[in-house]
From Swiss-Prot:
Record-linked InterPro entries: Calcineurin-like_PHP_ApaH, LpxH-like, Metallo-depent_PP-like, UDP-diacylglucosamine_Hdrlase
Cofactor(s) the protein needs: Mn(2+)
GO molecular function: manganese ion binding; UDP-2,3-diacylglucosamine hydrolase activity
Metal-binding is among the record's keywords: yes
EC number(s) per entry: 3.6.1.54
Protein name according to UniProt: UDP-2,3-diacylglucosamine hydrolase
Recorded name of the encoding gene: lpxH
Catalytic activity entry: UDP-2-N,3-O-bis[(3R)-3-hydroxytetradecanoyl]-alpha-D-glucosamine + H2O = 2-N,3-O-bis[(3R)-3-hydroxytetradecanoyl]-alpha-D-glucosaminyl 1-phosphate + UMP + 2 H(+)
Bilayer topology annotation: Peripheral membrane protein
CC annotations in GO: cytoplasm; extrinsic component of plasma membrane
Amino acid sequence: MTTLFISDLHLTPSRTDITECFVQFMRNEAVNAEALYVLGDLFEFWIGDEDCTPFAERIRNEFKALTTSGVPVYFIQGNRDFLLGQRFCRETGITLLDDVCTIDLYGEKVVILHGDTLCIDDLKYQEFRKTVHQPWLQWIFKRIPWFIKKRIVAKVQSGVRDDKQHKSLEIMDVNQQEVAQVMSQFCVKLMIHGHTHRPNIHHFEHDNLPLTRIVLGDWYSQGSVLKVTADGYSLEQRPFFTE
């Protein structure tokens, strides 16, 4: 059997190529998996579980069909869909996991996370993350009318784009010491995360222990899937479908 990992799809109505690739992946590949893990940023931005647009319903239906078929789906919130909550999970049958957690992957303990918490050198982002994850602020936001939410999110997205243009790639990448600290904290030799859009498999040593960090890829120009079996793992691309 195979366990699949994806992240950073950034699904949005305007990118039908990404959506179609995702749908084909769910129907033709994920349906045959032992489990599917989505490690954040499934959506370009998720405003709230009350989203009932045709696009949101289509994505819900794909997850519902998969879980109904017997494939468990696990989800970790990313920096763009941290408002995805229990209502979405109930409607789709997926399971929401903690921001950082460990799983048993064919006998090996593995730590999985979205990855933004590893980018501790980006102080401005970490402060922003701390603010938007305040329970009281999320409580207020969930009760704001939908049209106002959309305006707030549009302004936030514009600010994020402007901010990224003035940051170095090094600042937006993970901090290696933080990676080692988290892996040591959870006593694991393998970490899987997304967020940085830099798909790769990194082998390194810490305290004389061989460690591995797998970075999932984004779906901007092609799909990206991590396939894990009892015999090993492979980070693979999935081409977009062209008419």
